[in-house]
UniProtKB/Swiss-Prot annotation:
Protein name (database record): Ribonuclease HII
Purpose of the protein: Endonuclease that specifically degrades the RNA of RNA-DNA hybrids.
EC category name: hydrolase
Protein keywords: Cytoplasm, Endonuclease, Hydrolase, Manganese, Metal-binding, Nuclease
Gene Ontology molecular-function annotations: manganese ion binding; RNA binding; RNA-DNA hybrid ribonuclease activity
The gene coding this protein: rnhB
GO biological process terms, semicolon-separated: DNA replication, removal of RNA primer; mismatch repair
Source organism per UniProt: Thermofilum pendens (strain DSM 2475 / Hrk 5)
Cofactor(s) required for function per UniProt: Mn(2+); Mg(2+)
Cross-referenced PROSITE patterns: RNASE_H_2
Record-annotated membrane-spanning stretches: none
Details of cofactor binding: Manganese or magnesium. Binds 1 divalent metal ion per monomer in the absence of substrate. May bind a second metal ion after substrate binding.
């Protein structure tokens, strides 16, 4: 049996902070160990359990790679300057991580959580950027269906949480960073009122920031 991989992102929708993409690569025979450990979609886990699992995933013989996508790069994609759109940016990051794994050896299959409601379209974007051959399974909700994608979602979410906690030490408690969070909105309003513009960690192309300017 060969190596299999799962890839997922965390933080696509917030108005503050980066998006994090993680890929977890395991020998196929190790995937049941992840399942037995309780690995599943990060959204179904408590913060404490997610932290413990993120540390345990490498201990069973799986490797992890992470890419942090900063707000400036996200804004550039949303404007259609660096990429066609945010999905195109995400496909490029997925492909970058898969190519890194392929450079280290053969990979049987990569399972990915598609941000595009048409997964085949997202798969084609990723495949066009690959430098080697690998079977791709792209599905909506893959983090709930495939243990290996659940592992990637855990690593991505935990990595992003660590970054957000560090940012809060600099900027203060801005809540979850999502536009639906009253604490985040209050932070945004107070920051713009005081500084006249969004903070450096803002995704300035988000509608909420445009409304506040």
């Amino acid at each position: 049996m060969g190596r299999v991989a799962g890839i997922d992102e965390a933080g696509r929708g917030p108005m503050l902070g980066p998006m994090v993409v993680a890929i977890v690569v395991c020998p196929e025979e190790k995937v049941p160990l992840l399942r037995n450990m309780g690995v599943r979609d990060s959204k179904a886990l408590s913060p404490r359990r997610r932290l413990l699992l993120s540390r345990a995933i490498p201990s069973v013989g799986c490797s992890v790679k992470v890419r942090v996508v900063e707000p400036q790069e996200i804004d550039c994609a949303v404007r259609g300057e660096c990429y066609e759109n945010l999905n195109h940016l995400e496909a490029a990051v997925f492909a970058q991580l898969i190519n890194e794994v392929l450079s280290e050896g053969e990979l049987e299959v990569v399972y990915m959580d598609s941000p595009d409601p048409v997964p085949s379209r997202f798969e084609e974007r990723v495949r066009a950027l690959l430098k080697g051959q690998v079977r791709i399974v792209a599905e909506n909700g893959a983090d709930e269906k495939y243990t290996i994608v659940g592992a990637a979602s855990i690593v991505a979410k935990e990595t992003r949480d660590e970054i957000i906690n560090a940012l809060k030490k600099t900027y203060g408690d801005f809540g979850s960073g999502y536009p639906s969070d009253p604490r985040t909105l209050r932070f945004a309003e107070e920051w713009v009122r005081k500084h006249g513009e969004p903070p450096p960690i803002a995704r300035k192309e988000w509608a909420t920031w445009k409304r506040l300017r």
